[in-house]
């Protein structure tokens, strides 16, 4: 089978890249070892985070770091055995999270977020996926006035600097919005601009069907089997040999299975996360996507039930599941909302692919003329899928990307 482009990885990033190339007339083969959207993209909190112009930094407060070191929290957990391996990544993550550097990174990151809703909207229309989208923002609920007031000030800054819309909620207003939520919260914050997704895997599959309607082909195979040819690239798949002029690495946390073999070294880390679905107790309903701000877990009312998602687990990518955060979160969540029984046989786990400077790698590989990268989107893979696909496709076709790619180039890591 011959194609113009092979896209390695069929998560939301890879599918979005494939769609954007196919929309521009390229013949594309999309490859994954599993079905589309069945890895990291399957289990997120279902938010297209238009408010997320400031990437999640590494804590700088010594007291907070000391509390994290106790390893008993919901928002962060670590495997002690993995610390020596991940320490270089964490050190650079901490370095890039220092205030001045973090502010500069946020300025470079913001254009991606600013295009997130617009680009999703185009694909949602073409994929006829409107039934999966809720255009009602999401909420943060606060246990303390200190955290509430700090986040209110942060929201005011985002409104001033970026036009991000928000609504401050009193205790009573939060109770009116979520009548079955605990009355222990002192208030809330509603981010009005983001969209929510009732079934993140369903949205990836809707984009996948759009890709196939544009003439694209999906095949299963091992991305590590990629090799160069005089005219480009080839890979053996379960459906036979595929050859193409160009290849895109969109493998998320598994990008190194290809990049390392081709001579590129990226200091990447993963933030593993877990979810479980629950039925609400009879006669109750959760109306909004909601985070328990001081505890760091998320409740999302999805098609499959109320999805509880955890914060970050710092561990080896391939280590066995250790859903201690999920069980901690469930115990706390049951005190603030009447969750019913578990709806999943076991916890789901995924791995967010993270760079130390919190920005994805998007663009051309430095030492291969027809190799392209699109990975490292951390918490915002779902949010940034379509805009990543667009700017990469524009660059591959020799067009001027709507957002300059320089801030996201691989060269910043000297790989």
Question: What spans do the regions from the language model cover?
Answer:
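C-terminal catalytic lobe of FAD-dependent flavoproteins
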Residues: 162, 293-294, 334-415
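Active-site substrate-recognition segment that forms the wall
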Residues: 44-47, 52, 56-96, 225-233, ...
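Rossmann-like flavin
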Residues: 87-209
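Glycine-rich FAD pyrophosphate-binding loop
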Residues: 23-43
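N-terminal Rossmann-like FAD-binding beta1-loop-alpha1 element of flavoenzymes
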Residues: 3-30
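A conserved short coil-to-beta-strand element within the FAD-binding core of flavoproteins
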Residues: 169-177, 217-233
